[in-house]
UniProtKB/Swiss-Prot annotation:
Part of the 50S ribosomal subunit. Contacts protein L32. GO terms for biological process: translation. It comes from the Bacteria. It comes from Prochlorococcus marinus (strain MIT 9313). Belongs to the bacterial ribosomal protein bL17 family. One of its GO terms (molecular function) is structural constituent of ribosome. GO terms for cellular component: cytosolic large ribosomal subunit. The gene is rplQ. This is Large ribosomal subunit protein bL17. Keywords: Ribonucleoprotein, Ribosomal protein.
């Protein structure tokens, strides 16, 4: 039984789900906003906020953890350079999820997730 299991399955095996979330996190940090399904946006929010919190910490160990997660190494360095200035006064809540119109093909709930 999956009582109180907080990991959303997203209809994929574990390795595919982790790779998808890594890719979405990388894209969100690079572009600032991503259009995806609502369930993926909610799962992405946790990962993106974890990476921004690591960047705010700014230690070498945090930087290495972020490099191991985010696909683009230069993007990690850019995130660590500007995270303290941009999010220094915030204690979480670095992203915003905005619901949009359903997807035309399968009527899936869509959302835009963006960095605040």
């Amino acid at each position: 039984m999956r009582h109180q299991c907080r990991v959303p399955k997203l209809g994929r095996p574990t390795d595919q789900r982790k790779a998808m979330l890594r890719g979405l996190t990388t894209q969100l940090i690079r572009e600032g906003r991503v259009t995806t399904t609502k369930a993926r946006a909610k799962a992405l929010r946790d990962e993106a906020e974890r990476m921004i919190t690591l960047a705010k910490n700014g230690s070498l160990a945090s930087r290495r953890r972020a490099i191991g997660y985010i696909y683009d190494k230069q993007l990690v360095h850019a995130l660590f350079d500007k995270a303290q200035d941009r999010y220094g006064d915030r204690q979480g809540g670095y992203t915003r999820i905005i619901r949009t119109v359903p997807r035309r093909g399968d009527n899936a709930e869509m959302a835009i997730i963006e960095l605040v």
